[in-house]
Amino acid sequence: MTKSDLIERLTSKHFQLSVKEVEDSVKETLTLMANSLAQGERIEVRGFGSFSLHYRAPRVGRNPKTGDRVELDGKYVPHFKPGKALRERVNAANA
């Protein structure tokens, strides 16, 4: 599902809202979530899951074209951990 698909589905379920209102709401929600993560905050949506940052330590990598060693800096990466209800729902649907 893409962001456009999400907006389309929400608009069809909530016909009293315009496409523009739904689009603005989805964009604002994603912006708020991204800003929270950028500030190091953890986001928890009960029954769905949580978003947090995981630290990746500095390491030595290789340039795929030349094979040369490349020093890679440490960095934070977004991480999603599904909640129990989401895991159970996904497993039930794929059983």
Swiss-Prot record:
Cited Gene3D superfamilies: IHF-like DNA-binding proteins
Molecular function terms, GO-annotated: DNA binding; structural constituent of chromatin
InterPro entries: Hist_DNA-bd, Histone-like_DNA-bd_CS, IHF-like_DNA-bd_dom_sf, IHF_beta
Example GO BP: regulation of DNA-templated transcription
GO CC, any one term: chromosome
UniProt entry keywords in alphabetical sequence: DNA recombination, DNA-binding, Transcription, Transcription regulation, Translation regulation
Region forming the signal peptide: none
Physiological role: This protein is one of the two subunits of integration host factor, a specific DNA-binding protein that functions in genetic recombination as well as in transcriptional and translational control.
PANTHER family: DNA-BINDING PROTEIN HU, INTEGRATION HOST FACTOR SUBUNIT BETA
Cross-referenced NCBIfam families: hip (TIGR00988), PRK00199.1 (NF001222)
Subunit structure comment from the entry: Heterodimer of an alpha and a beta chain.
Family, similarity comment: Belongs to the bacterial histone-like protein family.
Stated name of the protein: Integration host factor subunit beta
Species of origin: Psychromonas ingrahamii (strain DSM 17664 / CCUG 51855 / 37)
